[in-house]
Amino acid sequence: MTTDDRTRRRATAAEDSGHYKAEADMSFKDHFSRQAADYAKFRSGYPQEVFDYLASVAPSRQLAWDCATGNGQAAVELATVFDHVIASDASKKQISNAQPHERVEYRVAPAENSGIKSGTVDLIMVAQALHWFDLDRFYAEARRVLKPHGTLAASAYNLLRVEPAIDEIVNRYYHEVVGAFWPPERALVEKFEELPFPFPEIQTPSFEMIGQWNLEHLLGYLRSWSATQRFIAANKRDPLEAIADDLRAAWGDPGQMRKVVWPLILRVGINAMPKPPKE
């Protein structure tokens, strides 16, 4: 037996036991561990209607994979409509801040090498993270773990909307104050609908994330941005000082609760099986 044969047998045995060994991915770019606790505290969740819809288009409700789970918000919601959820993230600190749930199994693993058994997943969800991945490797991994006709769902959202005066200040902060500190991949969020997506896509309903925030919550959310943290690390000062006075004036009573909206972009594809060869 050759070395290659032994390697293949070990991999097959590991996979048959339900644990496909993931190799370390040294290329992971961790932009979130520094502010993991704030990320969990200030992020709004997706509406339940999103998860109900995704469950309705999956071939069954046995297993979902929340890929790049972050603080586990989506994983916990998926657990309301799936029997079991594997929630993975390449950041150990994000996983340490994730929300526990009896039907959610958290793992530290890169998106491109999940360690999930082949052909077992009904739904893969990637919430606000697809732009960070090595897409070719991730899509190969998605095809490996999905069941026939399993579903890949990727979502993204851009800047929040409150009201025009506040939106203008947030836009200025995003582009002018911390704009130079966004990782290059962030630009892909703004072109999310143009990202390669090599699965037959289906038309999806429109969804929005909605929150009710006071001014302190908005400032906390802006401070949790990776660009804000990178600015602070580079300049040893808080970039929010550049807009704080304008934001307070536009907001009014800082305790006033305002509706905050993010329109969601949702792309859903099916793991179509190849057609059998013609006889």
Segments predicted by a language model, with ranges:
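Conserved Class I S-adenosyl-L-methionine
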Residues: 6-10, 193-279
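Class I SAM-dependent methyltransferase SAM/SAH-binding core
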Residues: 65, 71-114
